[in-house]
Amino acid sequence: MSKKAPGANVIAQNKKARHIYELSDNHEAGISLTGSEVKSLRAGHVNFRDSYVDFRNGEAFLVGLHIAPYDNAGYAQHDPDRDRKLLLHAHEIENLARSVEQKGYTVVPTKLYFARGKVKVDIAVGRGKKLHDQREDLKRRAEDRDTQRELARF
């Protein structure tokens, strides 16, 4: 049997996060889910555009992650917008919480994927970009695309 392609197990990516924030310090975190939530994720019914990580009582929670109810779950439906606990080591939570205390910094999810049958979340520390920085980024990416097209032509 052949192995799956390396990027085939990605559930969703938060492309908007790269546009709004300057991202650094990536971490892989587990996430505490119910069975119907995992089945809904396998179907791709997730939206985490406005989600972020909140720190309470020495624990990390993913807030704003919307996982649509699973169609075949029956009467035991999950709350689609509940806060979900992230599974990180205590020292990782302390480091992330310390970085969020600085003004203008937040922790945002960048990717949701399956790794060895478990759902994982890629989170990163982000600092909000100003509007002119976002525009400069778009211009630079457009120029890079144009140069790649020119190079591909020859």
From Swiss-Prot:
What is the top-level taxon of the source organism? Bacteria
One Pfam family cited in the UniProt record for this chain: SmpB
Stretches the record annotates as Disordered: 134-154
Q: Which InterPro entries match?
A: SmpB, SsrA-bd_prot, SsrA-bd_prot_CS
> Which biological process terms from the Gene Ontology are attached to this UniProt entry?
trans-translation
GO CC annotation, single: cytosol
Q: Which GO terms describe its molecular function?
A: RNA binding
User: Where would you find this protein in the cell?
Assistant: Cytoplasm
Q: What UniProt keywords apply to this chain's record, in alphabetical order?
A: Cytoplasm, RNA-binding
Which residues fall in a coiled-coil region? none
Q: Could you tell me what this protein does? A: Required for rescue of stalled ribosomes mediated by trans-translation. Binds to transfer-messenger RNA (tmRNA), required for stable association of tmRNA with ribosomes. tmRNA and SmpB together mimic tRNA shape, replacing the anticodon stem-loop with SmpB. tmRNA is encoded by the ssrA gene; the 2 termini fold to resemble tRNA(Ala) and it encodes a 'tag peptide', a short internal open reading frame. During trans-translation Ala-aminoacylated tmRNA acts like a tRNA, entering the A-site of stalled ribosomes, displacing the stalled mRNA.
Q: Which HAMAP family match?
A: SmpB
For this protein, the record's PANTHER family field holds: SSRA-BINDING PROTEIN, TMRNA-BINDING COMPONENT OF TRANS-TRANSLATION TAGGING COMPLEX
Name the family. Belongs to the SmpB family.
**Would you tell me the protein name for this molecule?**
SsrA-binding protein
